[in-house]
Amino acid sequence: MNKIVLLGRLIKDPELRHTENGEKAYTKFIIAVERSFKSADGARKCDLIPITIWGKKAEVICKYMQKGSCITLSGRLRTGNYEDKDGNKKYIAEVIAEDFKFIGNRKEQNEVVEG
């Protein structure tokens, strides 16, 4: 089973994109997920997790979310690799989100939206 559930905040505004043929909408964004423990200096650290979401759900996220918006999402982990322009092999990991829920944004703090 490949299932991930995350709670975090967007680090910048999401942008709606479309596949090359224009048929499918998607967005990619990064959320900061706070770790459950503090570092030696007492500070809380965050992990930056790349997220991709497709279709109508991507449109909803781009319409209602912005930098700082809090989101809970579930999906699956996808890994892959590619060669950069210098021929070095790079490895990637991202979450392909399937469902999400967020509460409010900077404009409407009490609105609940689910996808």
Each model region followed by its residue ranges:
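Acidic, gly/ser/pro-rich intrinsically disordered tails
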Residues: M1-K3, E15-K24, K38-R44, K63, ...
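Beta-rich strand-turn-strand
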Residues: W54-K90
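The conserved catalytic core of RNA pseudouridine synthases
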Residues: A43-I53, V60
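Short, charged/polar surface micro-motifs in flexible loops or helix N-caps
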Residues: K12-P14, S36-F37, K56-E59
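A short glycine-rich, His/Asp/Glu-containing loop-to-beta-strand
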Residues: K3-L7, A25-E34, D47
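Conserved positions in beta-strands of structured domains
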Residues: I11, R17, W54, R78-G80, ...
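Short, acidic/hydrophobic/Gly-rich beta-strand patch recurrent on exposed beta strands
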Residues: K28-V33, P50-I53, A93-I96
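OB-fold and OB-like beta-barrel modules that bind single-stranded nucleic acids
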Residues: V5-L10, I31, K67-R78, F100
